[in-house]
Amino acid sequence: MPNRLRLVVFDVDGTLVDSRAHIVDAMESAFSGVGLPVPSREAILHGVGLSLPELMAQLVPDQPHSVHQTLSEGYKSASLARHMATGQDDTAVFFPGIREVLDWLRADDFTLMATATGMSRRGLDRIIMQHRLDGYFQTTQVADTHPSKPHPSMLYAALSDTGVQAEDAVMIGDTSYDMHMAKAAGLHAIGVTWGNHPVDLLADADKIVNTTDEL
């Protein structure tokens, strides 16, 4: 991996912010709402990073597409309701050291930043507002307008928007979906161990880091 890269692309859930409690609560509400057994916390968090329909299909593969869609809408409604009820600061907090990493990269005029997330546009905008990240990212790619990870569509769009070549860019994420997406698009890949997938699932990463200091 080069010593200096032009574009740094971040996953959001599990990489920048810890929203695990919020995700599990919203998922429990969605499944209870249609009378289905709630999946385990481990199963739910293992699928974080996929688009909602893909995640629901992974959690209940025996259910039809219509149920996956209903679950996805139920999750969105529960997520918004919890956000409105508890306030912004309760739903997605920065992992320790992330603010410093983002501020450090932003201060470097050479470096561009982007996001590639399985979140919706509304969800990402909420986090950007919550953490006052307006102007940090040159491009933000979300699940609303792309195939689910690990399809490389989001990274292709980020490269196109910034005019950066794949060999000059890195994807930073906490799941195997992020690593596979990066490799499919020709980007370097850094896996972080504080998120949702165990280190053995990050084997495709060029580097694995355990702390934001290492990052």
Positions of PLM-derived features:
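Active-site neighborhood of HAD-like aspartate-dependent phosphohydrolases
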Residues: 1-46, 60
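Asp-based, Mg2+/Mn2+-dependent phosphohydrolase catalytic module
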Residues: 1-8, 121-215
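Substrate-recognition element of Asp-dependent hydrolases with the DxDx(T/V) motif
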Residues: 15, 27, 98-129
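Helix-loop "lid/cap" segments that line or gate small-molecule binding pockets
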Residues: 30-31, 51-66, 127, 158-159
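Short helix-capping segments at alpha-helix termini
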Residues: 32-37, 63-66, 108-109, 131-136, ...
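Short beta->alpha linker loops
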Residues: 47, 51, 93-97, 119, ...
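Metal-dependent phosphoesterase signature
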Residues: 58-103, 108-110
